[in-house]
Amino acid sequence: MTDFSLYLVTDPHLGGGPERVAGIVEDAINGGVTVVQLRDKDADEQTFREHAMELKRVCDRLGVPLFLNDRFAVAAELSCHVHIGQGDLPYVQARRQLPGHLMIGLTIETMDQLETVIADCTRAGIALPDVVGLGPVQATDTKPDAPQAVGVDGVAAMAKVARAHGIASVAIGGVGLANAADLARTGVDGLCVVSAIMAAPSPAEAARELLDVWEAGRRVAQPRVLTIAGTDPTGGAGVQADLKSIAAAGGFGMSVITALVAQNTHGVTGVHTPPADFLDEQLESVFSDVTVDAVKLGMLGRADTVRQVTGWLRTRPHGPVILDPVMVATSGDSLLDPDATEALLELATVVDVITPNIPELAVLCGEQPAPSFDAAIEQARRFATDVGTTVIVKGGHLTGPRADNAVVYPDGSVHMVANPRVDTTNSHGTGCSLSAALATRMGAGHPVDKALDWATRWLNEALRGADALQVGSGSGPVDHFAVTRRLLRAADATPWPHLRMGAPSDGIITPSDTQSPAPALAPAGPYTRALWEATGDVLGEILDSGFIRGLGDGTLSREEFLFYIDQDAHYLRQYSRALATLSSRAPDAPAQVDWATSAAECITVEAELHRTYLNKGLAETGVSAPSPVTMAYTDFLIARSHADDYVVGAAAVLPCYWLYAEIGLILAKQNHPEHPYTDWLDTYSGEGFLAGTVKAIARVEAAMAGAGPDQQRVAAQTYLSACVHEREFFDQATRQGWN
């Protein structure tokens, strides 16, 4: 299906003249333009043909369709699509004149014009326009003779009718950044612009800005997602898994049943297919009442069912369609009749995205299963090009430490999604779940690459939680709500346990329920020993967190690590101020020097590590703004070091030394020269940092020894609060990016 998100109409009088049009178009396509229309009313036939050939070479190379403005002979010769206006050849005649495989777009200025062309096509038995340009939205200098503007509301009304008849639509006339967001909510399939890009200093940047606003405006708070698939009584696959996945991805799930499947975690024992008229009745009940923002197709089973669903998708309005070509269950059981493959190939031309596993991709291509991920991508390239549909390549069926995914576009370009393999035998329904989550994110307005990034990350955590579910005695399901529950726990506003308990009647702090491991860096005396003995619960939570486990084994995503490094750069700036304050308040010269030296190191040695990572080209942007978690921690440190007793401030800054050193030494056992985060592991297990930590422990011991009982208890509670802030600081990287 053609992506009409950003439709560029050229103008030879903008951007420096006709000779610059091809360069502007190429730049604009690189910025995100998805369709190009060559318009040059004044050019003679030969000149127009030359310009069309030049643009065709650019568009073909970059995988973007090219429409020609009302030049049928040139379009037929060069195999280009055509756009016509109300004053050009009547649409029915145009459709009969142009070869059927070429698209025709039509300008629509009023509702009467739209209803007339639909009626004319129905009477003549002619296919409806492939796309209609609705407008003008407002008056525009590029078409001074344009009819009266219809406004955003007029576009919305016509877009609803067009969508109901399966006609794509774009808003035209006076479209730009000022109204792109409003137009994105009208139901049109894209924005059609001229001067907004042709006259821009940077066409690529102008295209990116328009596309960003368009995509943001298209996002639905809770997309309505329809799954059309078979069932799984044990809940791990089929529509049961789809509905869980849709909910987890933020959608409202609806379901139409194609087959009642008797299956569990061991396999399939029977399939019952309801009558075809009942499938029609189910589909009618949904499409006649509810706007469908996305469709996920799963098990269709039989050739007639595949063709039946294909017919519905061709004639009813809906958002993006994601096809999971369910042919073989994880258990090895066949879920598609042998004669249905041809019908499925036809369906693949109708959908937006197809998500086969490795064996299914091989069947679709008529080849042997790919032995490697690279080979699978090449298979997908051939299939995507032949069918014109985006393919998701999934590495889960391969072997090795990686289970990467990829988006393969019809033009052959690839978007890779890194994904560490999860060691589990409980993977029932992963294909259903990934495609349903993908459909939901796309239904919310996210492009397929961002949608796959999200769905891959989500499914990886769902797989990591699968073993704990204990559903069935075979290959069990994934934990669809693992992320949801983790984020709910993180959002809990209940006061931290050590603050609710208060200080003990004897001693300065209560030991943790979880025994603290023997520290690699020993306490400097009884007070720091008591602090360490209270650390076990928090330290255990930190070591068990997904962030620290991924940091240790190298599977932490690049995005999560860079978020952490970015926030740590903000943290160190404020932490150095807290240390400098302690230097000014320290009771003796050695402590003053040590705190001051530590403050300087924060903004030199360690900050250099962060600048190195952030400037390696690994981050799209430099240091951003501090997160709420980072601000809470740094504000806490600044307040404790400035406003409380010296001993309290000293206790507050200690966990950043001691916990980091202990964690760094534990993770160092997994370090190796090829480790993606070897610099970080080297730094926090290195002799320099460890020596500084030993001195900090000694300074806190001395401060505690010189303080009174009440000060000691406040300092101990402050130390534990800082430990919890450390846990939150590490964990925040795995909480961002889920919206």
From Swiss-Prot:
Query: Which residues are noted in the entry as 2-[(2R,5Z)-2-carboxy-4-methylthiazol-5(2H)-ylidene]ethyl phosphate-binding?
Result: T140, D141, T142, G174, V194, S195
One annotated GO molecular function is: phosphomethylpyrimidine kinase activity
EC code(s) of this entry: 2.5.1.3, 2.7.1.49, 2.7.4.7
Q: Give the reaction(s) catalysed.
A: 2-[(2R,5Z)-2-carboxy-4-methylthiazol-5(2H)-ylidene]ethyl phosphate + 4-amino-2-methyl-5-(diphosphooxymethyl)pyrimidine + 2 H(+) = thiamine phosphate + CO2 + diphosphate; 2-(2-carboxy-4-methylthiazol-5-yl)ethyl phosphate + 4-amino-2-methyl-5-(diphosphooxymethyl)pyrimidine + 2 H(+) = thiamine phosphate + CO2 + diphosphate; 4-methyl-5-(2-phosphooxyethyl)-thiazole + 4-amino-2-methyl-5-(diphosphooxymethyl)pyrimidine + H(+) = thiamine phosphate + diphosphate; 4-amino-5-hydroxymethyl-2-methylpyrimidine + ATP = 4-amino-2-methyl-5-(phosphooxymethyl)pyrimidine + ADP + H(+)
Amino-acid positions noted as binding 4-amino-5-hydroxymethyl-2-methylpyrimidine in the UniProt annotation, renumbered to this chain: Q263
Q: Which CDD domains match?
A: HMPP_kinase (cd01169), TenA_C-like (cd19365), TMP_TenI (cd00564)
Pfam families given for it?
A: Phos_pyr_kin, TENA_THI-4, TMP-TENI
The record's Gene Ontology biological-process terms are: thiamine biosynthetic process; thiamine diphosphate biosynthetic process
| Keyword Ribonucleoprotein attached | no
Similarity field: In the N-terminal section; belongs to the thiamine-phosphate synthase family. In the central section; belongs to the ThiD family.
Query: Any additional notes?
Result: There is also a ThiE protein in this bacteria (AC Q8FP55).
Biological role:
Condenses 4-methyl-5-(beta-hydroxyethyl)thiazole monophosphate (THZ-P) and 2-methyl-4-amino-5-hydroxymethyl pyrimidine pyrophosphate (HMP-PP) to form thiamine monophosphate (TMP). Catalyzes the phosphorylation of hydroxymethylpyrimidine phosphate (HMP-P) to HMP-PP, and of HMP to HMP-P.
Q: What is this protein called?
A: Thiamine biosynthesis multifunctional protein ThiED
Lineage of this protein's species?
Bacteria, Bacillati, Actinomycetota, Actinomycetes, Mycobacteriales
Gene symbol here is thiED
